[in-house]
């Protein structure tokens, strides 16, 4: 629970400074690779990691699911699962409860109809790529839909930033431990640090 407390404490600080708003949430998930080698003391792959297909490629590892502030891109919720758990299965668990709107890519289609959906939250989920491609831009109605999709995409883009920070700034490209618990704790801590890194300039300005 220490990692979760670190994230909570960091976000309380950022909220107090007006850097973390809570009107909207963007959800997303990314696969994190785990060693596939069985050359270890157990002579087996980590049983808590699983294979998952992304596009035409298979990955073995875990999945990091995050809920981030739609305004700033700062992360408020982190969940770690096996790699084969679908994005939509965790989507509603990534909401903090105070938001009125939420955004997600096409992998979250139908999330508002799930049993764990929150009725007070309006979801803005991306169209399936094929469906958007079929839009006729010369048609006024289709052009408006495409414009709305671009606006949704601009909001969703903010959730990519924290993933980029933990991978590029902190070098987190693959799991470091066996089991979900330790790796999830590390992820939570890294996202807390990424929040500070993302607003480091504003925090330094505030120090005067």
Provide a role label for each language-model segment:
Residues 167, 171, 197, 201-204:
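Hydrophobic alpha-helix feature that most strongly marks membrane-spanning transmembrane helices
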Residues 100-101, 106-181, 185:
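Helix-centered, glycine/charged polyanion-binding patches within enzymatic domains
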Residues 1-119, 128, 188-194, 200-202, ...:
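Polybasic low-complexity intrinsically disordered regions
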């Amino acid at each position: 629970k220490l990692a979760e407390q670190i994230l909570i404490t960091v976000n309380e600080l950022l909220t107090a400074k007006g850097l973390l708003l809570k009107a909207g949430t963007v959800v997303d998930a990314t696969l994190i690779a785990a060693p596939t080698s069985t050359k270890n003391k157990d002579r087996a792959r980590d049983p808590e990691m699983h294979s998952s297909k992304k596009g035409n490629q298979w990955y073995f590892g875990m999945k990091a699911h995050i809920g981030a502030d739609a305004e700033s891109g700062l992360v408020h919720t982190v969940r770690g699962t096996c790699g084969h758990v679908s994005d939509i299965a965790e989507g509603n668990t990534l909401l903090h409860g105070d938001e009125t709107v939420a955004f997600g890519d096409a992998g979250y289609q139908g999330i508002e109809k799930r049993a764990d959906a929150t009725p007070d939250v309006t979801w803005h989920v991306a169209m399936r790529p094929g469906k958007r491609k079929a839009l006729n831009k010369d048609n006024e109605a289709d052009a408006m839909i495409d414009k709305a999709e671009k606006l949704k995409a601009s909001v969703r883009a903010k959730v990519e930033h924290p993933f980029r920070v933990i991978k590029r700034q902190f070098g987190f490209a693959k799991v470091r431990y066996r089991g979900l618990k330790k790796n999830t704790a590390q992820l939570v801590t890294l996202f807390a640090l990424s929040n500070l890194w993302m607003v480091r300039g504003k925090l330094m300005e505030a120090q005067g």
